[in-house]
Amino acid sequence: MTNLRKTHPLMKILNKSFIDLPAPSNITSWWNFGSLLGICLIIQILTGLFLAMHYTSDTMTAFSSVTHICRDVNYGWLIRYLHANGASMFFICLFLHVGRGLYYGSYLFLETWNIGVLLLFAVMATAFMGYVLPWGQMSFWGATVITNLLSAIPYIGSDLVEWIWGGFSVDKATLTRFFAFHFILPFIIAALAGVHLLFLHETGSNNPTGIPSDADKIPFHPYYTIKDILGVILLVLILTSLVLFSPDLLGDPDNYTPANPLNTPPHIKPEWYFLLAYAILRSIPNKLGGVLALVLSILILALMPLLHTAKQRSMMFRPFSQCLFWILVADLITLTWIGGQPVEHPYIIIGQLASILYFLLILVLMPITSLLENNMLKW
């Protein structure tokens, strides 16, 4: 009798993706983050679903409905904080996943990489709209400031902003549509993640050496299922520790004040995972220039395959490129710190220098260094 998992139309797809999938024998824990992102997405969809059962997307009741969830709903506080901190875990895994891709040259799988960039944009859009829903001070003013950036687009900008707002300011119409989009986008993300996997399995996984590993493959199950379970246990442990011991560690105290259009908070800043892009936006005095830099800071990832000048795929055997990669990581941490600081000396100049260094590293220094390494190896 043939094995059901190899013959059943549905089981066959799962079998080829998660059980009998040939995987390189030498992939490290850096390859765990794909599965962790899948777990994060499942956690977010489930907790979000239960929150949506009690949330009301009306400006008059949104804030009190979140309060009601935390105080009156059974384990509502747990669901709410799992959802809020789950987003932070999602972005930590995302940044590490993208960083792994940059370090080991995974961006040379063009379709997989481009869908990954699209996924990053979709997750950022979802997180931004989710932050608006509790209708606290930072929700309202964050929504006002970020949506207002679109007014920098020549000719159609101001019309576009009013069209997104559904009026002349961030109000009931804005909140309702943000809730609708925040609800539907995770399912679109799940579908895109499926396509991301589909393209990945067309080529097979990359590995730390960057050398094709067709001659040395092992089955995904049990080797990498066990390895992934360890990652999941650590992820859940960190997330539950954060939720149970310090749920507001990554949030903003201003968001516990109901939204007030007549009172601007002293420092408007987004959640920590947007601070690096926010710092790049703020470092350019011109509005349109800032918006372009903001978009390019993420869109630059799509250019990575074009900027790859090295003869070797991975950075594993390229010490100079490794140095620049870790300088880039330090630069991104600096930008994250600057994004949370007030706009005053010396933070302005540090932010501007860090922003210049970010683009300089990716567009100029790293490709030149790769060419230099090729030359040193007589390639």
Swiss-Prot record:
Residues that coordinate or bind a ubiquinone: H201
Residues that coordinate or bind heme b b566: H97, H196
Pfam families recorded: Cytochrom_B_C (PF00032), Cytochrome_B (PF00033)
Annotated keywords: Electron transport, Heme, Iron, Membrane, Metal-binding, Mitochondrion, Mitochondrion inner membrane, Respiratory chain, Transmembrane, Transmembrane helix, Transport, Ubiquinone
Cofactor binding note: Binds 2 heme b groups non-covalently.
Subcellular location, principal: mitochondrion
GO molecular function terms noted in the UniProt entry: metal ion binding; ubiquinol-cytochrome-c reductase activity
Keyword Flavoprotein: no
Recorded coiled-coil stretches: none
InterPro entries on file: Cyt_b/b6_C, Cyt_b/b6_C_sf, Cyt_b/b6_N, Cytb/b6-like_sf, Cytochrome_b, Cytochrome_b_C_euk/bac, Cytochrome_b_N_euk/bac, Di-haem_cyt_TM
Annotated S-S bridges: none
Chain positions recorded as heme b b562 binding sites: H83, H182
Membrane topology term: Multi-pass membrane protein
Bilayer-crossing regions: 33-53, 77-98, 113-133, 178-198, 226-246, 288-308, 320-340, 347-367
Cofactor(s) required, per the database record: heme b
KW Heme (keyword) present: yes
Biological processes annotated in GO: mitochondrial electron transport, ubiquinol to cytochrome c
Subunit relationships: The cytochrome bc1 complex contains 11 subunits: 3 respiratory subunits (MT-CYB, CYC1 and UQCRFS1), 2 core proteins (UQCRC1 and UQCRC2) and 6 low-molecular weight proteins (UQCRH/QCR6, UQCRB/QCR7, UQCRQ/QCR8, UQCR10/QCR9, UQCR11/QCR10 and a cleavage product of UQCRFS1). This cytochrome bc1 complex then forms a dimer.
Record's miscellaneous remark: Heme 1 (or BL or b562) is low-potential and absorbs at about 562 nm, and heme 2 (or BH or b566) is high-potential and absorbs at about 566 nm.
Family note: Belongs to the cytochrome b family.
The name this protein goes by in its record: Cytochrome b
The organism's taxonomic lineage, starting at the top: Eukaryota, Metazoa, Chordata, Craniata, Vertebrata
Gene name linked to the record: MT-CYB
